Structure formats: structure tokens, C-alpha cells
């Protein structure tokens, strides 16, 4: 029994947990008004850089670059144009299907 008492005394004691009121330094370092940067925008920017040796960029540094802003704006405009184009094509297809359905229905009604 003396051995079991000695072994229990050698166990490390747990320290009381400190309150989590301390904020992480990373949260304090980033201001709330800093704009959010999309990772896909950064990757696209890096892919479009020609002749640049260092392609490992820090997002908040890249965001300040005018070329980055221009590329992102151009990509967003292109995405809007493609979206509008797809909506137009889909609406034409739906209208075409409705017209074909009506004509087929009229043809079938005449057959009876």
C-alpha cells in the first residue's frame, strides 16, 4: 500500500485553467474595417502575373496593389456578362420548349 500512496503523490497536479479573457494577438492586429480578400482572387492575380519572380504574396499587401484591383474588377465584369448570357440562353431554350410543346399538343389534338 505504501507503493500506491507514493505513486499517487508523484502524479503531476493539474494547474487551474486561466480565464479565456485574453484575446489572441492576431485578432487585435487586424482592424475591423480591413476589406476581405477572396483567396480565388489572389490565386487568379498570381496566375496573371507575368515576369514576376516572387509569387508568394501576402493577401493584405496584394489587395493594396492597383493591378490586383483592376484584374478583380475585370473578372467580376466578365462573370456578370457570362451570367447574363447564360440567363438569356436558358430563357430562349425554355421558350422554345414551351412553343414546341404547344405545337405538339395541337398536332396530337388534330390527330384524334
From Swiss-Prot:
GO cellular component, as recorded: membrane
Topology in membrane: Single-pass membrane protein
Superkingdom of this protein's organism: Eukaryota
Residue stretches spanning the membrane: 81-101
Keyword flag Membrane: yes
Region annotation Disordered: where it falls in the sequence: 1-32
Keywords recorded for this protein, A-Z: Membrane, Transmembrane, Transmembrane helix
Compositional bias annotation for Basic and acidic residues: 15-31
Primary localization class, coarse: membrane
Compartments reported by the entry: Membrane
Disulphide-bonded residues: none
Ranges of biased composition (kind: Polar residues): 1-11
Protein name per the record: Uncharacterized membrane protein ECU04_1080
Species annotation: Encephalitozoon cuniculi (strain GB-M1)
